[in-house]
Curated annotation (Swiss-Prot):
Monomer. The active site is at residue 106. The record marks 16 as: Substrate discrimination. One of its GO terms (biological process) is SOS response. Mg(2+) binds at residues 11, 105. Keywords: Cytoplasm, DNA damage, DNA repair, DNA replication, DNA-binding, DNA-directed DNA polymerase, Magnesium, Metal-binding, Mutator protein, Nucleotidyltransferase, Transferase. CDD domains: PolY_Pol_IV_kappa. It comes from Streptomyces coelicolor (strain ATCC BAA-471 / A3(2) / M145). Transmembrane segments: none annotated. This is DNA polymerase IV. Poorly processive, error-prone DNA polymerase involved in untargeted mutagenesis. Copies undamaged DNA at stalled replication forks, which arise in vivo from mismatched or misaligned primer ends. These misaligned primers can be extended by PolIV. Exhibits no 3'-5' exonuclease (proofreading) activity. May be involved in translesional synthesis, in conjunction with the beta clamp from PolIII. The gene is dinB. GO terms for cellular component: cytoplasm. It catalyses: DNA(n) + a 2'-deoxyribonucleoside 5'-triphosphate = DNA(n+1) + diphosphate. PROSITE patterns: UMUC.
Amino acid sequence: MRTAPTILHLDMDAFFASVEQASKPSLRGKAVVVGGLGPRGVVATCSYEARVFGVHSAMPMGQARRLAPHAAYLVPRFELYRSISEQVMRLLRELSPLVEPLSLDEAFVDLDAGGAARDAETARLAGTKLRTDIRTVTGLTGSVGLAASKMLAKIASEAAKPDGLVLIPPGTERAMLEPMTVRTLPGVGPATGDHLRRAGITTVGEIAEAGEDELVRLLGKAHGHALYAMALARDERPVVAERETKSVSVEDTYDVDIHDRVRVGVEVGRLADRCVRRLRASGLSGRTIVLKVRRYDFSTLTRSETLRGPTDDPAVVREAAARLLDSVDTTGGVRLLGVGVSGLADYTQEDLFAQAAGDRAEEPAEEPGTEPAEAHSPSPAERRWPSGHDVRHTELGHGWVQGSGLGRVTVRFETPYSGVGRVRTFLVDDPELTPADPLPLVADTEGGAGQPSSGPLPLPASLPKSWSGGGGAAATSRP
């Protein structure tokens, strides 16, 4: 393990919810929940204000509504989240060529590899500057952990939340880890934690005291060896730049089981088109098409077909997905469908036979009711108004959907740069109201530095956790 705290872990604070608060002045400082809003929806993330009421990620949306009935419930805007994530990742790549993204809002950075830090002092300066740059470019906050290993850097960033920085000086790792619960260590979930608790082991220090042989006896060879090493603060894993994408996929869960076989086919076609758009956006193609079907009884079936060469042609992917669907019995009802592409490559091999078959497969898609929804501009009566999504009115300007139903849609007219806006209600087919693209969170920027027009978002009134390290082993800083 290295001798300087030059591995940085960044975790954006309540990322999806923070984006929504930054773009909607009326939601700043309020409880915000982002996720699927149907009866089977789950929470993707929530603001710290919502966490005070017990709401958390992966919770069923119905339970979240019971805990926080007055929160704002919004449909995710993934394209906006990806765009902001790329702004953050560009800032990380300015620090080092070794950036390991873990998700849209989380990444490791090897500061030593880029010359950005060589010791604790320069690492702290780099982490502080990064947090300032993220706030300037995106208007959002992120928490930074600095340590000599990936495991410790991630533990430090958790302790820094929200909007803080924690540095673990080399030589203090064991003292910092010992009083922490076993669940602090990566790979220790509820089952392993309960198993250790029944053996009288509840802290990381007690894991180290138990010894490697006892841990192997309790947990098996691989897990026992790994857990013992982590308890001793040993972690030699390097930061791996831009881990290779293995597959691209999309899926939808339906509020009501689909029984109509024709509609199932239409949904599979739409998913295939969405998957190809994501594939092309990444500059990739693939040769293995995968269909996922979750039936009414929660049984999940996966079917795949490998083509003769990579493709990014929507007709080819649609036809392959349709063939796979032919082998699946859906008569009892379908609650989830997914289409994916694996065997990825950065080039496309033309397959004339598949292309010709795909052209034929496209013809039925032009019939009413079977064309993918995104392939044409819907009339006003056909439009959906997802809660939280952007709209524009010809007279009132930019706003977002607060809710819709009973033939009405309610819109709040405000932007990231305005004050709290006024609310108006329209008929869902009002010709002056149209869907709109999201506005940048920071005004007057072009992918670079700028200033949040209405100031930084305030810290939540109630912080979710506090640093539990002992003896001053870690240094914590907040604005």
